């Protein structure tokens, strides 16, 4: 049955422990289906409400674009970056070198080019990265989950490593 009211979809971005702050920091991407009843009116009201709350908005072309943006360009991408940190940490452990010292080699490259972000090699837990993988039914994306579980088995205290970097994550 078709709804007689417009439905707006807006993915949430931010870290749970500072969600109120992050909701205002990030642009609120949203979408309303092109064939939604009273879509232009709903869109206008939504933008006005968000602006009143101090939240910037950006309308996307269709719901699939926004959902894929959330899963592919945000949470799965973060998963791959953390996987690489996990792999590089396992290599550092294997060769008995300090992970942070090893990564300091890339600090200036990141500073000048912005394309060598250092991630922290913790276990991927939480409510976003791993659960969002299940929405895609992709063997390739599921490698993130497999690598994460392998890391937890191979590295002592893998699930507690984040504590070392907690202050840098704020």
Place the predicted regions along the sequence by residue.
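Interdomain hinge/lid region at the active-site interface
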Residues: 64-68, 78-79, 83-169
């Amino acid at each position: 049955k078709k709804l007689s009211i417009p439905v707006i979809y807006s993915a949430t971005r931010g870290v749970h422990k500072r969600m109120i702050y992050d909701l205002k920091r990030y642009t609120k991407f949203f979408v309303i289906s092109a064939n939604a009843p009273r879509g232009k009116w709903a869109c206008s009201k939504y933008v006005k409400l968000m602006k009143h709350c101090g939240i910037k908005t950006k309308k996307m072309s269709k719901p699939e674009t926004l959902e894929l943006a959330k899963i592919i360009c945000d949470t799965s991408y973060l998963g791959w970056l953390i996987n690489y940190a996990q792999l590089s940490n396992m290599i550092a452990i294997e060769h008995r070198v300090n992970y942070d010292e090893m990564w300091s080699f890339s600090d200036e490259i990141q500073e000048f080019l912005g394309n060598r972000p250092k991630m922290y090699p913790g276990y991927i837990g939480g409510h976003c990265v791993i659960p969002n993988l299940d929405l895609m039914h992709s063997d390739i994306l599921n490698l993130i989950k497999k690598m994460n579980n392998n890391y937890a088995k191979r590295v002592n205290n893998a699930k507690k490593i984040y504590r070392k970097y907690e202050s840098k994550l704020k």
